[in-house]
Design a protein with these regions (language model features):
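Glycine-rich flexible loops
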Residues: 1-270
């Protein structure tokens, strides 16, 4: 077997979590990431029949039965992932209609997956229906997006348009816009179900007064989605109290649609 720490997807997970911490998105043990892997990817590094222990997931997800995930651990600090990946990350195999997780590697200190695991898995299930190539769900606490939920309407169209108008690339990067949930108790199946429902129509779901969820085909794409939305929110928070002299008009955004071959979410542009 090859050394799992040399796997390209493991290296990228370590780099991404380290970068998220460096950006200030994942203070203390905040934030979590899950990466869907194919069995062929895992088998090069692990005997998939060698189960270290089983963990109850607390939910049912039949469409994810048999899937493999590399996921961050509960109570773990992203700043420590690069130094002790086998403690802060775990590779699991879902069985029993998603009700059981077989631990194949990691969580070496007896830990388990993130407390937001239900929201991650339910979001994976919904995004796979929309895009079979989806592989990543990422949650973090970017300061400006978080701040914006205190001073801006949580109406999804209005929130999306505000972000699109802050930076030319926004409508190109996330033409599907952002969906928004009002404050809900985190770490529950209820917020997991609500997030998954929102994931049906957008890859970015904001949790008001908490953070954001992003989904994508790989770690780079998902990180970039959040990074772009956060930059737009930063600009918004810097200018929201000032008189607005210029903006990106709907007509200009239609030009961006044509130039970059994207389609803005229906009804979001005039």
């Amino acid at each position: 077997m090859k050394d799992i720490l040399t796997a390209s997807w493991m290296v990228e997970m370590i780099r991404t979590t380290t970068n998220m911490y460096a950006h200030g998105w994942d203070e203390r043990n905040g934030g979590n990431v899950s990466l869907l892997l194919d069995e062929a990817q895992v088998c090069q590094y692990l005997d998939v029949k060698n189960v270290i222990r089983t963990i109850d997931t607390g939910f049912t997800a039949p469409t994810l039965d048999g899937k493999y995930f590399l996921v961050t651990g509960t109570g773990k600090y992203f700043k420590n992932v690069q130094y002790a990946p086998e403690v802060n990350l775990g590779l699991i195999h879902l069985t029993d209609n998603g009700e059981t997780a077989e631990l194949l590697w990691g969580f070496a200190d007896g830990g388990k997956f993130t407390s937001e695991f239900p929201a991650h898995m339910m979001s994976h299930a919904e995004r796979l229906k929309v895009d079979p190539q989806n592989r990543v769900v990422m949650h973090c606490h970017p300061a400006n997006l978080l701040a914006m939920t205190y001073v801006h309407s949580l109406d999804e169209r209005a929130f999306t348009r505000a972000l699109w108008q802050m930076c030319t690339e926004c409508i190109v990067v996330f033409p599907d816009g952002v969906n928004v949930l009002p404050w809900m108790l985190c770490g529950t199946n209820e917020i997991g179900l609500a997030t998954a429902e929102k994931m049906q129509t957008a890859r970015l779901v904001i949790w008001a007064q908490h953070g954001i969820y992003g989904a994508g085909k790989d770690l780079d794409e998902t990180f970039g989605l959040i990074e772009t939305a956060e930059k737009a929110a930063e600009i918004y928070m810097k200018i929201a109290h000032l008189p607005l002299v210029n903006t990106i008009t709907d007509g200009q955004m239609h030009l961006l649609e044509q130039r970059f071959g994207v389609k803005a979410r229906d009804g979001y542009l005039e």
